[in-house]
Amino acid sequence: MKEVMIVVGAGQISMAIARRMGASKKIILGDKNIENAKNIQKTMVDAGFDVEVIEMDLSSRQDILKMIDMAKNYGLIKMLVNGAGVSPSQAPIEAILKVDLYGTAVLLEEVGKVIEEGGVGVTISSQSGWRMEQLTALEDEQLACTPTEELLDLEILQPENIKDTLHAYQLAKRCNEKRVMAESVK
């Protein structure tokens, strides 16, 4: 069985990482837009990579689990690349929190349960999480450690506490950094 790389988000950054790190691996590429995933698949297969695609929504735990199950059928999961997300200029606050914040937290949690010892992962994020007012130590801890199904219930993430889509995006990116830190030591 091959080592498996899970790639979420069929964009150019994800493809560049997969091309650099995915030689001799089975690559499972998931995206909400299956046509985007198929286009990246074709480019990569034409270049000699072994890629399968799956339609999946990062905001859905069920879709994440379906993708992980697919990956496990091909071998040992050794790598995760998360390049999925929505833009603050193109999505409402609720979608930003559900995809960029909650979805990334669920993905890290679920892949963390199955990735092989010595496995690696990268979550493409943004410096935007550092371009807002400083959070308290408690807020940072909550973003890092709150169980995923309770994450969107945090006071800091309630609509009345979020100024606009940019602020939601900044909070999501801060949460991404904190979740990666917390998951990396489990």
Q: Could you say what each language-model-derived stretch is?
A:
Residues M67, V81, L107-V111, I115-E117, ...:
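Hydrophobic positions on the long internal alpha-helix
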Residues F49-D50, M70-N82, S89-Q90, E116-G119:
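A glycine-rich helix->loop->beta "capping" turn
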Residues M1-I28:
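Canonical Rossmann dinucleotide-binding motif of NAD(H)/NADP(H)-dependent dehydrogenases/reductases
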Residues P88-S89, E117-K186:
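Catalytic loop of short-chain dehydrogenase/reductase
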Residues M44-Q62:
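Rossmann-fold cofactor-recognition segment
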Residues S24-N39:
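Conserved glycine-rich Rossmann-like NAD(P)H-binding loop of the short-chain dehydrogenase/reductase
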Residues S59-G75:
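Conserved Rossmann-fold cofactor-binding substructure of NAD(P)-dependent oxidoreductases
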